[in-house]
Amino acid sequence: MFIFGGYVKGSKSNDLWKFDLNSMSWTCLGQGDKIETITSPNRPCQRIGSAMLCFNNAIYLFGGHDAFNEKLNDLWKFDLASNQWAKID
C-alpha cells in the first residue's frame, strides 16, 4: 500500500510512504526516514486529495490541491525500481 502527501504537523506533505503488510511497517520512499517537505522541480509538490495508481512497477500520481489549496492538474510517475520521480507532460 502507498500513500502520498496529506497533512504532517499541520502542513501539507510531499512524502511517499509504503506500507509492508508482511512486516506491518512503513517506509518513506525517495527521502530516507526524515519527515520534511522537499521542494524540487524533480518531484511533486505538497498536496492533498490526489489520485494514485500502481501499474507496471510504477506509481502514477495525479492532481489534488497544493499548499495554497489551488487545484493541481499534473501527472507524475514514481519508478519503484529506481525510487525516482518523473513529471509526465
Residue ranges of model-derived segments:
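Kelch-like beta-propeller repeat domains
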Residues: 1-89
